[in-house]
């Protein structure tokens, strides 16, 4: 209320909502949705295995014992259960499926299976008519992969970053860099937005788990 922000992206963390396989607890997110509805706040729900916050992939412990095929079925079940539970809320304006799925150089995640990712997109589309948001790195991607499957393309914008090998570095990129990339793929999507905007440089502790707080 103090900040006056009226649009939030909400990551749904798998390890919080399905601690036991097949048993979902939506209590935390039901509260967020209810508060948003009461305050006329719009939400983008980020769903899937890989969602914002280091280490990006947040799976419950029981997933470790699954085969790859079983794991994919569990992810699809997570998506279906999430959309079915929340799609009645008018506060949610679109679904984000995974987070920067084509970015292989950040996060502790397995390699992307592009065919399976398209299955995820298709499943969410079949469950609800809201737009699908796909996110890409603003600096480390041409945005074409995300634009090919998205309704809304969200891009990150970082200026000063930390690398454990070379320390701090700054991207020598102007606003024209992002604008031209957006113009290049504009006909492929309904809109291009900034989904992450850096507020301050990250430091070495970005590679550590920060906990629930």
Task: Tell what function each PLM region has.
Residues 1-2, 75-83, 136-146, 212-213:
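Short, acidic/polar
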Residues 1-61, 109-133, 148, 171-173:
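Aromatic-lined substrate-binding rim segments of carbohydrate-active enzymes
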Residues 3, 35-42, 81-93, 120-130, ...:
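A structural motif corresponding to the C-terminal end of an alpha-helix
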Residues 8-10, 43-47, 93-97, 132-134, ...:
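Hydrophobic faces of well-ordered beta-strands that scaffold small-molecule active sites
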Residues 13-17, 49-53, 99-104, 138-141, ...:
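Solvent-exposed loop/turn segments at secondary-structure junctions
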Residues 13-26, 60-74, 98-112, 160-176, ...:
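The substrate-binding groove and active-site-proximal loops of carbohydrate-active enzymes
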Residues 49-57, 75-110:
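Active-site groove signature of glycoside hydrolases
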Residues 114, 119, 126-206:
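Glycoside hydrolase catalytic-domain groove-lining segments
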């Amino acid at each position: 209320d103090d900040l006056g922000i009226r649009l939030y992206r909400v990551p749904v963390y798998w390890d919080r909502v399905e601690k036991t396989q097949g048993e979902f607890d939506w209590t935390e997110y039901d509260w967020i949705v209810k508060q948003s509805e009461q305050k006329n706040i719009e939400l983008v729900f980020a769903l899937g295995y890989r969602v914002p916050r280091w280490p990006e992939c947040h799976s419950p412990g029981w997933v470790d014992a699954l085969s790859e095929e079983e794991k994919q079925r569990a992810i699809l079940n997570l998506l279906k259960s999430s959309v079915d539970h929340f799609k009645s809320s008018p506060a949610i304006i679109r679904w984000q499926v995974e987070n920067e799925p084509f970015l292989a150089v950040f996060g502790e995640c397995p390699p992307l299976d592009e065919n399976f990712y398209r299955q995820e997109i298709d499943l969410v589309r079949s469950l609800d008519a809201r737009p699908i948001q796909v996110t890409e790195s603003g600096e480390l991607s041409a945005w074409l992969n995300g634009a090919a499957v998205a309704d809304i393309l969200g891009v990150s914008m970082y200026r000063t970053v930390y690398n454990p090998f070379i320390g701090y570095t700054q991207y020598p990129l102007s606003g024209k860099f992002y604008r031209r990339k957006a113009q290049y793929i504009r006909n492929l999507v309904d809109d291009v937005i900034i989904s992450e905007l850096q507020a301050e440089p990250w430091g070495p502790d970005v590679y550590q788990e920060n906990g629930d707080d």
